[in-house]
Swiss-Prot record:
Residues the record lists as binding Mg(2+) 1: D69, D73
Protein name per the record: Terpene synthase
Motif extent (DDXXD motif): 69-73
Annotated EC: 3.1.7.11
């Protein structure tokens, strides 16, 4: 909580305003974005005080985005507990999320670099462009191509990765270009999340079963199923229903398996894993990033 208080120092006010935000912090996530920042510092070698501020900024922006995502997606659970807006209401949750975004921008100013704010705004714009077009597809019922999906994902999921890297580069002597690696990681994280949402038991325990189907989301396996079987409209009709019926969702999962959509997704994940490792090696190797990639391979046990 200390790191969230604004410069006015009104702790009592902030405690009230930030209740929806601190609520989701009671069950910490995997801190993967903070781990990535520390991993990239193997190459960038910036001072710890700057690294810690960047890590705080990324975590604040990530967690605030989760509050908004859960409202936009009509989610029920987040990290195994009821979503914040089901406890504190939509209005307070939106305000808390927006407030934390500006607290994060205020923290960017503390980095005391003339380009830091511009970098932050650039990447937040990219993130919202990616998030926005994904919502547009869902709400207008337009199934994107895989290439359109990948561009959206690099903007949305890769946006915070690039924000961390670009902020760190402001204080580094390294001139390495990490754009390709950040894009690969963004794709890998999102496609892995799409796959695990439909296949991995622990996702069902922390969210509702196959939540992406209830949301009506054009996730990577869904896009493959719809695009590869244009004459079979079962999957797209199930998606249109935004169903909470577990039996219907289980049937959709069997269709995705039958259509080869899970197999295609696993092949894509394996390819992204290879590409990430090759890019890490090209950049000189990084044991911390390699360890993160190893940890992410839990999707492979769902075969």
């Amino acid at each position: 909580m200390e790191g969230l208080v604004n410069n006015s120092g009104d702790k009592d006010l902030d405690e009230k305003l930030l209740q929806p935000f601190t609520y989701i912090l009671q069950v910490p996530g995997k801190q993967i974005r903070a781990k990535l920042a520390h991993a990239f510092n193997y190459w960038l070698k910036i001072p710890n005080d700057k690294l810690n501020i960047v890590g705080e900024i990324i975590q604040m922006l990530h967690n605030s985005s989760l509050l908004i995502d859960d409202i936009q997606d009509n989610s029920i659970l987040r990290r195994g507990i009821p979503v914040a807006h089901s406890i504190y209401g939509v209005a307070s949750t939106i305000n808390a999320a927006n407030y934390v975004i500006f607290l994060a921008v205020e923290k960017v100013l503390r980095l005391e670099h003339p380009e830091a704010t511009r970098v932050c705004i650039d990447q937040l714009l990219e993130l919202h462009r990616g998030q926005g077009i994904e919502i547009y597809w869902r709400d207008n019922f337009q199934c994107p191509s895989e290439d359109e999906y990948k561009l959206m994902t690099i903007r949305k999921t890769g946006g915070l990765f690039m924000l961390a890297i670009r902020l760190m580069q402001l204080f580094s002597e390294s001139d390495a270009d990490f754009t390709k690696l950040a894009g690969i990681l963004g794709l890998y994280f999102q496609i892995r999340d799409d796959y695990c949402n439909l296949c991995l038991q622990e996702y069902s325990e922390n969210k509702s079963f196959c939540e992406d189907l209830t949301e009506g989301k054009f996730s990577f396996p869904i896009i493959h199923a719809i695009r590869s079987r244009p004459d079979d409209r079962q999957v797209i009709q199930i998606l249109r229903q935004r169903t909470r019926d577990v039996e219907v969702k289980k049937y959709c999962v069997t269709l995705l398996e039958k259509f080869g959509s899970f197999s295609h997704t696993r092949e894509t994940l394996a390819q992204l894993d290879r590409e990430a490792r090759e890019e890490v090696a090209r950049l000189g190797g990084n044991p911390f990033l390699e360890a993160i990639l190893n940890d992410l391979l839990n999707w492979d046990r769902t075969k």
